[in-house]
Amino acid sequence: MGVYTFENEFTSEIPPSRLFKAFVLDADNLIPKIAPQAIKQAEILEGNGGPGTIKKITFGEGSQYGYVKHRIDSIDEASYSYSYTLIEGDALTDTIEKISYETKLVACGSGSTIKSISHYHTKGNIEIKEEHVKVGKEKAHGLFKLIESYLKDHPDAYN
């Protein structure tokens, strides 16, 4: 088994407290509302929303994937950090055992810097290259931009 790590960083005009509330704490409600083509439904299968919680994410019609299940590994509202691991679903191919994600929002001027790290745990001697994860990174960034746009259009939301 190999582990391949990829990092991504981008900025936002939105402060980390608002972004964290929308992008992490209320994502299960907000994303299906503003981007049903991306995520149709998010539901908690086990747990209370904290570490150890298992969620099922059902993707929107036209997505190349049907669903994934992920486990929340950590969530820290004080440091605006969140980590979770994909543990089941058709995004995990026969070559990938699991994918772990770490996200941290950091204050940057009046906005934020979003730092994301993904760890792909492969089966056997399979190698994951940056170009293999590029499409997923672009989709995640696009979804983030939708949330950012929603927050700009709704300045009283998630304060």
UniProtKB/Swiss-Prot annotation:
The keyword Protein biosynthesis does not apply. It comes from the Eukaryota. GO terms for cellular component: cytoplasm; nucleus. Gene3D superfamilies: 3.30.530.20. Keywords: Allergen, Pathogenesis-related protein, Plant defense. GO terms for biological process: abscisic acid-activated signaling pathway; defense response. Transmembrane segments: none annotated. GO terms for molecular function: abscisic acid binding; protein phosphatase inhibitor activity; signaling receptor activity. InterPro entries: Bet_v_I/MLP, Bet_v_I_allergen, Plant_def-hormone_signal, START-like_dom_sf. The keyword Flavoprotein does not apply. The record marks T11, I31, T58, T113, I114 as: Crucial for IgE recognition during allergic reaction in human. It holds the Pfam family Bet_v_1. Belongs to the BetVI family. This is Major allergen Mal d 1. It comes from Malus domestica.
